[in-house]
A protein has these predicted regions:
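Feature marks short, highly hydrophobic, charge-poor N-terminal signal-anchor/signal peptide-like helices
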Residues: 1-8
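Short alpha-helical basic/polar micro-motif
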Residues: 3, 16, 110, 198
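Polynucleotide-recognition surfaces of large bacterial nucleic-acid defense/processing enzymes
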Residues: 11
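Core segments of small alpha/beta cavity-forming domains
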Residues: 55-143
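Structured, amphipathic secondary-structure segments that form assembly/contact surfaces
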Residues: 111-217
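Juxtamembrane and targeting peptides
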Residues: 5, 14, 19-95, 176-180
Length: 217
């Protein structure tokens, strides 16, 4: 019995010695918090980050060289017409190209009318009428656009008329049939590569957003 009391007394003595050396768990956690608090980064108040400035001519440089003649022309266009955007123009020209090309191939003069200048419309209509007289029918399908690039641009500060020349590379499928419906040229599954250079024109002083096809080169 005496031996048990002695062992118990030794155990209590060792416990208190360890507590004195190592410290309590609560004290350890408190020290960690103090250390973490000392590591906190002090941020300067009232610092506002200014948003990066956007270059109003970025859309120009997406398509032409920064110091090129065309770049200077586009800057003048934007100075006169703040709504003008090279990105929007190219996007619209892409759609117009497909519409005009397919309308011409399929002989749809009604669709061509609002998109062409008078001289070009007259030329296109003449070719379409000639095909009809010969009994030829063209069935065309637009496959897709491979490339579109701005070749040149001009703007008259006097007349406010702008001309933009673009190069198009596309893929189409065309079949030519005679009056009896027999295929005399092409194949429905044959895809041809098409390359065109077109000039679009617009009076920037007018409210109409439509650019007309001025010529084909």
């Amino acid at each position: 019995m005496l031996q048990i009391f002695i062992l118990a007394a030794v155990a209590i003595f060792l416990f208190w010695r360890l507590r004195a050396v190592l410290g309590s768990r609560d004290g350890f956690e408190k020290n960690i918090k103090d250390i973490n608090a000392s590591k906190k980064v002090i941020k300067s108040p009232d610092i506002i980050e200014e948003p990066s400035k956007v270059n109003p001519h970025d859309d120009i440089f997406d398509y032409v060289e920064e110091n090129s003649k065309s770049a200077e022309v586009f800057k003048k266009m934007k100075e006169f017409d703040s709504d003008f955007s090279v990105n929007k123009f190219v996007s619209g020209a892409k759609m117009a190209y497909e519409m005009i090309l397919m309308a011409f191939e399929n002989g749809d003069t009604e669709k061509l009318g609002p998109l062409l200048e008078h001289k070009v419309l007259k030329s296109f209509t003449s070719v379409i009428e000639k095909r009809k007289k010969e009994g030829l029918v063209i069935e065309a399908k637009f496959i897709g656009m491979r490339d579109i690039r701005i070749i040149d641009a001009s703007f008259s500060e006097k007349t406010k008329v702008a001309d933009i020349t673009l190069s198009f590379k596309s893929e189409i499928s065309t079949v030519v049939k005679d009056a009896e419906g027999s295929i005399i040229e092409g194949h429905p599954d044959e895809i041809k590569k098409q390359k065109d250079t077109w000039v679009f024109t617009k009076d920037l002083s007018e409210k109409s957003p439509i650019w007309l096809l001025k010529s084909t080169l």
